[in-house]
Amino acid sequence: MALRLNPIPTQTFSLPQMASLRSPRFRMASTLRSGSKEVENIKKPFTPPREVHVQVTHSMPPQKIEIFQSLEDWAEENILAHLKPVEKCWQPQDFLPDPSSDGFEEQVKELRERAKELPDDYFVVLVGDMITEEALPTYQTMLNTLDGVRDETGASLTSWAIWTRAWTAEENRHGDLLNKYLYLSGRVDMKQIEKTIQYLIGSGMDPRTENSPYLGFIYTSFQERATFISHGNTARLAKEHGDIKLAQICGMIASDEKRHETAYTKIVEKLFESDPDGTVMAFADMMRKKIAMPAHLMYDGRDDNLFDNYSSVAQRIGVYTAKDYADILEFLVGRWKVEQLTGLSGEGRKAQEYICGLPPRIRRLEERAQARVKESSTLKFSWIHDRESTTLNAPREEHGEIFRQYRSEKC
């Protein structure tokens, strides 16, 4: 049975922040324990930079845990195979100046010279990507909320627990590498970045996966492909600006994300084989909610709309766009052969119809939104010493409307 906690009014991804629910000093995530106006008006320490949704827990029927228990051997053979032995993995030091070498200072100087050719807009996006990677403790925590697959002891030898720990260990290199690169580049305000990371980890994330591995693995499938695209595009742009070393860094991270995407999509593919009706309804549920980006609770101590503003720069320079969102959904629909599912219940068929019709609907809404965005504006980002970066004009209103509209449509 699903437990509904903390009845806070839901808001879309793009609504303005609610200052009355935040302390002026602390803005890390918490969930209010009452829906009363009296409680809502009290500023609490460590409250979120934006409200989280109504919290639903343990929505998966307990008997479905048996499905994941029965897939233990399958996961060992088919999912753990997508991990690399530590000794065969690249490490951040492979791509950075060697501090123990006599040429360290010269190598740093060369890195900084290359970094000078990169525009501020690019650094805003690279910093945002790095901060997202650095919030890894949150993502491991999220995976360990999932019923039937969590690491029950911290060192469990189940296939699911081994995957979660090893995946986390591989992902840990990404934030380490980008963090060190940005530190050496001299182009960014590291203290503001470090504060943003601390705020974000303290805030957590609100993926609305309800402790369900169905929802959780659909979410991670989408997110790994999104990060693969994002890092691939930062690699492309670095190359265009002449920084081949940085392009290599971003490309190696993208390669990891692609491998992880393959593992997660394979899990969901197996769920479609084992329980097509339950899986297609979970897919539709996740898409109705909209896939929230992992760093959507991002805050730097100053900008209440930091994530939206960072996302707008990423959209403008072509690192991650609304078109990419539709492309990912279309890819997953094809990858999991959703259109070809048969023998579904009435609710399952409605979910199937909804999902298959969603990509073109998002594209149409995005085209209309783009037609209305005729200008751009500039905003200061603390990450780049309050220099200005160009954003799309009214990004939250225009692009948020896309998701408000498609989420409101019924099956």
From Swiss-Prot:
Keywords: Chloroplast, Fatty acid biosynthesis, Fatty acid metabolism, Iron, Lipid biosynthesis, Lipid metabolism, Metal-binding, Oxidoreductase, Plastid, Transit peptide
UniProt catalytic activity: octadecanoyl-[ACP] + 2 reduced [2Fe-2S]-[ferredoxin] + O2 + 2 H(+) = (9Z)-octadecenoyl-[ACP] + 2 oxidized [2Fe-2S]-[ferredoxin] + 2 H2O
Annotated CDD domains: Acyl_ACP_Desat (cd01050)
Cofactor: Fe(2+)
EC number: 1.14.19.2
UniProt subunit comment: Homodimer.
Pathway(s) served: Lipid metabolism; fatty acid metabolism
Entry's family note: Belongs to the fatty acid desaturase type 2 family.
Residue sites binding Fe cation 2 per the record: E171, E224, E257, H260
Location of the transit peptide in the chain: 1-28
GO molecular function, one term: stearoyl-CoA 9-desaturase activity
One GO BP annotation of this record: fatty acid metabolic process
Protein name: Stearoyl-[acyl-carrier-protein] 9-desaturase, chloroplastic
InterPro entries associated with the record: FADS-2_CS, Fatty_acid_desaturase-2, Ferritin-like_SF, RNR-like
Membrane-spanning segments: none
PROSITE patterns attached to this UniProt entry: FATTY_ACID_DESATUR_2
GO cellular component, one term: chloroplast
Species: Glycine max
